[in-house]
A protein has these predicted regions:
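An alpha-helical, amphipathic repeat domain used for nucleic-acid recognition
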Residues: 1-107
Length: 107
């Protein structure tokens, strides 16, 4: 993984298997770069390109925090989880607090 396109491919491959919030995917990409066996300056370039990759994925609707959070809230509610548990879960996944409160008011 030495190019930005490789990072995009990895992100799309990850998203084809798992749903993810923007912040969680950012963490996943940083961990992937950290584990790769490339020079430090190449890693630095890839780290700097993460916002661009995330923006591209958002633009093409591969990641959408609202859809992700809504889906997770509905799943957790159907599993009988409490509102406090769900809010804590969304907080851990770094979903914006305004967004999570909006989802709860819609339900």
């Amino acid at each position: 993984m030495t190019e930005i396109s490789d990072l995009v491919k990895y992100a799309i491959n990850y998203l084809s298997k798992y749903s993810s919030s923007k912040k969680n995917l950012e963490r996943i990409l940083k961990n992937k770069i950290r584990r790769t066996n490339i020079e430090k300056n190449e890693k630095f370039i890839l780290y700097k390109s993460i916002p661009e990759v995330l923006k591209k994925l958002e633009k093409n609707n591969f990641i959408n925090d609202y859809n992700y959070a809504t889906s997770k809230v509905n799943t957790l509610i159907s599993n009988g989880k409490s509102k406090a548990f769900i809010k804590n879960y969304l907080f851990k996944k770094e979903i914006d607090e305004k967004l999570s409160s909006n989802i709860f008011t819609e339900l």
